[in-house]
Amino acid sequence: MKTFLSAVLAVCLFALPVSAQNGDDGDSGRSLPRMASLRSKLVNARSGPGSRYPIEWVYKQKNAPVEIIAEFDLWRQIRDWEGSETWVYKPMLSSQRWIKMTNKGTSSIYAKPEHDAKVIAKVEDQVIGKVEKCPEDKDF
């Protein structure tokens, strides 16, 4: 049930816009864009790909989901759940997929992706959940 719940959360609650780079390969040889998450509870967001660039802000939520949209050496340009774009150091990212509830208030989680499905949980804003398995017809 946890697997399905995580997949439903991913489908319903965290859909980032697809970049124009769709299908391109980055410096790493992996396709762009792709999903990742923040590895640490403190991650510096920089204005460019290098430590010489100023810190714009600091992410303070471990496992928060992000979309990698560009690569340069050991730096990754990411888009976060609010649509902000910045650069982070590659070791601060994880390939594990997590989702983040971004609806204000409490939202329902359903047993199946159908309009008449049973509500199995209530989730509050800013809750993070691990994606254990995606539905076969979806790729997140």
What do the PLM-derived regions correspond to, one by one?
Residues 20-47, 58-62, 69-74, 79-84, ...:
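SH3-family beta-barrel domains
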Residues 54-55:
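Beta-strand-rich domains and repeat architectures in extracellular enzymes and scaffolds
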